[in-house]
Amino acid sequence: MAPDFPWLTAIIALPALSTLLIPLLPDKEGKTVRWYALIVGLVDFALMCFAFWQHFDPQATEFQLAESYRWLPSLGIQWSVAVDGISAPLVLLAGFVTTLAMFSAWQVNQRPRLFYALMLLLYSAQIGVFVAKDLFLFFLMWEIELIPVYLLVCIWGGKRRRYAAMKFLLYTAAASIFILVAALALSLNLPGGPNFDLGAIAQQDYPLGLQMWLYAGLLVSFGVKLAIFPLHTWLPDAHGEASSPVSMLLAGVLLKMGGYGLMRFNMELLPDAHVRFAPLLVILGVVNIVYGAFSSFGQTNMKRRLAYSSVSHMGFVLIGIASFTDLGINGAMLQMLSHGLIASVLFFLAGVTYDRTKTMVLAEVGGLGQVMPKVFAMFTVGALASLALPGMSGFVGELSVFVGLASSDTYSATFRTITVFLAAVGVILTPIYLLSMLREMFYTREMDLSCDLGQPTNVAIAGNAPVCFGNDCVLPSNAIYEDARPREIFIATCFTVLIIGVGLYPKLLMQMYDAKTQTLNTSVRQAQAIAKQPSEPIAALQAPELTMPH
């Protein structure tokens, strides 16, 4: 194909247009549609890999693979898509996780056609968010993504699925209003009339007052998606009720939209305001790390514990973005990509465990390691990656953020010391709540064979003998659990190979965005150098005047 082939448009359109053929597929049980959706996902992911391999230059800092088509010219709206160093890796992450999430959904037998149609539509919307070069198009893709997620949680979720789905919708839809307001304010203040193009907006110097107000609004919008405290409460509910394939997308891709938005809009378009808000981001990041870690201890539901773990890990993204160092911003990007892989495999394995035990309550399982050794081994690797074991991707991302903040000359030594210390407390807590979860799930508890055998529970046993925990005993028939199937081993292996590969050779991903993050940091450092007195941000919060086109 010619180099000017519309790669990104094709990548966005393929999954969405493929849903039109799903009603024509022959079977209603889902055997055909699941393979159809998987093939579409694989083809789309292959298109991404080929397009970036052939036409993406990681050393270039400008937009690449750019396409622009007139859509609503009178309003300055175009179908404009492109990628650069911070969007291309996230596009690949979305394609990788979504394809494997569809492969993991083999057990879905309730309305499978609708399920896979929504998964493919979500696939397109996710890619659209990361490649949109037009602010209005970004907002449109951001809103489209809400619809399939809401339906996927509401229809295929747990007992409280409607509550969780509605909470997610209300939080995200309400917060996204600020994205629309920011898009209108930035485009209407450009010379020559409304223009939603990111390149044109990035070249414009906006008044500090306008930047401050828009930054605050966008921080709320992206903070909801990134699960920043106290805007995070939708996440544990959504994870607790969503099916595991949907949880993989919530943790692996949707959370990253918030981090991407902060880097793309708050940092790149509003650098003067970013300088003023950066200390707040660091504080919020520390709160996320510590609060998420402590909250995980009190969770009896496996997926809710993993959800609060995600809240904790997203704190490193905030700190890295506000570090004013190349290493810290690189660490924030790597943390997003690494967490996307690690959280996805953990939620997948939580689903594998639920398929056998039919419970997410940690107190109702135990001793699974002896009857499901393969699941135990895979879960252990995922947990070790999540607690940032050296040699795995999580370690490199978190270490880069720590060193980046500690070496930043923007903050005082006292501020840096306190921040690093508190963040380290959260890091220390991570292995405690993760390893305790593994102990509850997989290690056989102390057996008492003298107890009454009349009370069977949902706890697994080892071998053929009854197992008693206090007054609760398990009969042998209750403990027949199938170990991991080849499909499940393949999915977990795909994630594990990347997690270890990036941990051992982080340049594999960092080379894609290093040049771009350096450019971002240079721009905010320049804004920092010309920043006015510290008292001015407060005065700058006077309501700005918007220039309306004649």
Curated annotation (Swiss-Prot):
Origin: domain of life: Bacteria
Transmembrane region(s): 5-25, 36-56, 86-106, 114-134, 135-155, 168-188, 212-232, 243-263, 277-297, 311-331, 332-352, 375-395, 418-438, 489-509
Principal place of residence: membrane
UniProt-listed Enzyme Commission number(s): 7.1.1.-
GO biological process, one term: ATP synthesis coupled electron transport
Function per UniProt: NDH-1 shuttles electrons from NAD(P)H, via FMN and iron-sulfur (Fe-S) centers, to quinones in the respiratory chain. The immediate electron acceptor for the enzyme in this species is believed to be plastoquinone. Couples the redox reaction to proton translocation (for every two electrons transferred, four hydrogen ions are translocated across the cytoplasmic membrane), and thus conserves the redox energy in a proton gradient.
HAMAP family: NDH1_NuoM
PANTHER family: NAD(P)H-QUINONE OXIDOREDUCTASE CHAIN 4, CHLOROPLASTIC, NADH-UBIQUINONE OXIDOREDUCTASE CHAIN 4
Protein name: NAD(P)H-quinone oxidoreductase chain 4 3
Organism of this sequence: Picosynechococcus sp. (strain ATCC 27264 / PCC 7002 / PR-6)
Source lineage: Bacteria, Bacillati, Cyanobacteriota, Cyanophyceae, Oscillatoriophycideae
